[in-house]
């Protein structure tokens, strides 16, 4: 039997190894071990800590799993105030900020600044004592916030213990400030899952981050895709810094995530250049930003400048123009989804929002309509952020004429006339018709989509014809369509029929993640499909999986696991899969990540590609173990430049990143 001292050494070794692999996975996007190996290390640690509880410490990775739910959040006092920033709304106001600094300092010398994107998230304050995380709190009123330490511990991008790879002494105590946020893609997927479960969606990524962080049950926070960028420190005891950029360098060295777009610049003119650059880059970033922050770099000057009211003189938040506009709701229609969910959609007078013309906006569900009191004929404020679907923020009640018409989701399905029900505990109304053509149409559209089987030429109108003519009753029927049956459909000539049948034949050997996505399993989007494909490698292995196997995979919780198991237990679904197999549909076995030729490499595509679409290029990269990103960063290995390549190419050239032509990329990927 292991003695206590041996257990202590094993526990310390396991903690160090797990935190190392956490950083490789969550911060560097470069894992060295499989999920199964990681889970084995974690379970070994948990077992040892249970056997030897005297060695269970606050910085243990086992603490990330989540403690017992709280009844309420306790207050947490910050060691130093978390001040709010004054705002600048134009380039002239940015110049005035610089003039104010020089007047106060009685100096005309050019100042050095640090500029950074202003993340639209939730500000938090972390306190580390002797290198160990002891408290995590929301900003609150600036003097005290809510103690959310249990939830903070579940975020893998936040070290439980400061990493120190040198002999340099760590601060005795330090406050680390940062912004907790949710990436736009993760936000969309979270809302998709919530809508599918009949839960109200979050209005925007910031609200989703705030709601996820302020969960009394930390296990819920642990399942939400939260991340954090650190941008400053408060009280520091036992360590001195000279410049703000030194602080950021130390934070990175200690294992914290710092935004890669932060820059040190000389003079206010360079700040304005960065402000313009960020506005151009804004919609390409994987997270939402609502401006830029400028800070005086010299910490001694920050001290001299001090604060006025509740804002520091040495920093300013430079806001972007709002991505909102007003318009009028002309009508409200109801769409029926593939799971039978009825979604109300506002048809609006077209209006430009964030540079894009918007004429439709989702209203989510009846609760959302009632809460905002949205009526046909209302003047409303609509919002569009990044590529998120436009939404109605609020009604301009003062514009009402009295002729506006309240809206209620119908009691019968607008597609098939079946009864519409709302199950207890759900926000969604659902059609319960077993043969609802709208549900089948949506299911087939999902199956043949680019993210699924990617069958070219099978558009929405043709799918509707196939369903209405009762030529298909499930996705597998597509592979049994005859030449003559297709030729009898509207606008289908000999050539178009031949092309469609060829496209259907070509789709028979997709990558495994594509067929998993195409099946339409509830809560399983493209991201989870890729995770499942990497883990199980064949469809049969996934079909025969167990709950324990699924729950051992990071990013898959009880809800997703239950949905997967229920799908494959369903006799009707199993029959469809058997029909697909008999038709010759056979997904390619997923390559082990370790043997894939592009493993660990990150690609960015820019310009127009002539031999493939961007999505096809991305699929090639991911199928060979690499990653496709939207922006050029220090982590980028290759930029693939097509015709009329833009700023991404210039940035890559300046950074010395390898540039590939489309042909060179295809050769590297083994496609030519």
Curated annotation (Swiss-Prot):
Catalytic activity line of the entry: NAD(+) + (deoxyribonucleotide)n-3'-hydroxyl + 5'-phospho-(deoxyribonucleotide)m = (deoxyribonucleotide)n+m + AMP + beta-nicotinamide D-nucleotide
Catalytic residue list: 118 (n6-amp-lysine intermediate)
A GO molecular-function annotation: metal ion binding
EC annotation from Swiss-Prot or TrEMBL: 6.5.1.2
Uppermost EC category: ligase
Presence of the UniProt keyword Kinase in the record: no
BP terms from Gene Ontology: DNA repair; DNA replication
Swiss-Prot/TrEMBL cofactor(s): Mg(2+); Mn(2+)
Binding site for NAD(+): 35-39, 84-85, 116, 139, 179, 295, 319
InterPro entries: BRCT_dom, BRCT_dom_sf, DisA/LigA_HHH, DNA_ligase, DNA_ligase_AS, DNA_ligase_CS, DNAligase_adenylation, DNAligase_N
A Pfam family it matches: DNA_ligase_OB
UniProt domain BRCT: residue ranges: 593-672
Residues annotated as binding Zn(2+): 413, 416, 431, 436
Keywords per UniProt: DNA damage, DNA repair, DNA replication, Ligase, Magnesium, Manganese, Metal-binding, NAD, Zinc
Its job: DNA ligase that catalyzes the formation of phosphodiester linkages between 5'-phosphoryl and 3'-hydroxyl groups in double-stranded DNA using NAD as a coenzyme and as the energy source for the reaction. It is essential for DNA replication and repair of damaged DNA.
Entry protein name: DNA ligase
């Amino acid at each position: 039997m292991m003695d206590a001292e041996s257990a202590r050494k094993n526990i310390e070794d396991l903690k160090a190894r797990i935190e190392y692999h956490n950083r490789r996975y969550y911060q560097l996007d470069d894992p060295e071990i499989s999920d199964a190996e990681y889970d084995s290390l974690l379970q070994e640690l948990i077992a040892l800590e249970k056997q030897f509880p005297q060695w269970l410490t606050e910085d243990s990775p086992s603490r990330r799993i989540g403690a017992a739910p709280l009844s309420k959040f306790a207050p947490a006092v910050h060691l130093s105030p978390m001040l709010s920033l004054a705002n600048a709304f134009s380039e002239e106001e940015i110049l005035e900020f610089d003039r104010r600094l020089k007047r106060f300092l009685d100096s005309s010398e050019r100042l050095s600044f640090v500029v950074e994107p202003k993340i639209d998230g939730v500000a938090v304050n972390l306190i580390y004592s002797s290198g160990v995380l002891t408290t995590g709190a929301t900003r609150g009123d600036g003097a005290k916030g809510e103690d959310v330490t249990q939830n903070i511990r579940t975020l893998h991008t936040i070290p439980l213990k400061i990493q120190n790879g040198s002999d340099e002494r760590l601060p005795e105590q330090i406050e680390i400030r940062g912004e907790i946020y949710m990436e736009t893609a993760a936000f969309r997927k979270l809302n998709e899952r919530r809508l599918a479960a009949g839960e109200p969606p979050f209005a925007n990524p910031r609200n989703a981050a705030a709601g996820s962080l302020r969960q009394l049950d930390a296990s819920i926070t642990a399942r939400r895709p939260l991340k954090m960028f650190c941008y400053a420190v408060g009280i520091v005891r036992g360590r001195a810094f000279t410049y703000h950029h030194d602080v950021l360098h130390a934070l990175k060295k200690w294992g914290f995530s710092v935004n890669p777009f932060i820059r040190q610049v000389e003079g206010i003119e360079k700040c304005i250049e960065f402000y313009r650059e960020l506005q151009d880059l804004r919609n390409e970033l994987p997270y939402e930003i609502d401006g830029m922050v400028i800070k005086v770099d010299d910490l001694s000057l920050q001290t001299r400048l001090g604060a006025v009211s509740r804002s520091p003189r040495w920093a300013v938040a430079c806001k972007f123009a709002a991505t909102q506009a007003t318009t009028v709701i002309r009508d409200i229609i109801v769409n029926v989804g593939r799971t039978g969910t009825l979604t109300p959609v506002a048809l609006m007078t077209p209006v430009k929002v964030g540079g894009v013309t918007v004429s439709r906006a989702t209203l989510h569900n009846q609760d959302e309509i009632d809460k905002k009191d949205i009526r046909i004929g209302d003047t409303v404020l609509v919002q569009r952020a990044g590529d998120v679907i436009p939404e109605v923020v609020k009604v301009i009640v003062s514009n009402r004429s009295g002729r506006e018409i309240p809206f209620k989701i119908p009691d019968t399905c607008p597609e098939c006339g079946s009864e519409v029900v709302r199950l207890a505990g759900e926000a969604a109304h659902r059609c319960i018709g077993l043969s609802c053509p709208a549900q089948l149409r949506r299911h087939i559209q999902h199956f043949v989509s680019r993210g699924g089987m990617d069958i070219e030429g099978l558009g929405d109108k043709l799918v509707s014809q196939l369903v209405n003519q009762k030529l298909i009753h499930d996705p597998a029927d597509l592979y049994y369509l005859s030449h003559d049956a297709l030729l009898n459909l509207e606008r289908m000539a000999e050539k178009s029929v031949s092309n469609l049948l060829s496209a259907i034949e070509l789709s028979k050997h997709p990558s495994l993640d594509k067929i998993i996505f195409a099946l339409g399993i509830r809560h399983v989007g493209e991201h989870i499909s890729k995770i499942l494909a990497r883990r199980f490698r064949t469809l049969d292995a996934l079909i025969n999986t167990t709950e324990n196997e699924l729950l051992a995979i990071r990013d898959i919780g009880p809800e997703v696991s239950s949905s997967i198991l229920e799908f494959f237990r369903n006799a009707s679904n199993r029959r469809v899969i058997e029909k697909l197999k008999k038709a010759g549909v056979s997904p390619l076995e997923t390559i082990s990540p370790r043997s894939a030729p592009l493993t660990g490499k990150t690609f960015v595509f820019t310009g127009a590609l002539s031999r493939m679409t961007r999505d096809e290029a991305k699929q090639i990269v991911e199928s060979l173990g690499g990653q496709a990103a939207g922006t050029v960063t220090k982590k980028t290995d290759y930029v693939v430049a097509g015709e009329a390549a833009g700023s991404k190419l210039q940035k890559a050239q300046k950074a010395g990143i390898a540039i590939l032509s489309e042909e060179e990329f295809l050769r590297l990927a083994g496609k030519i």
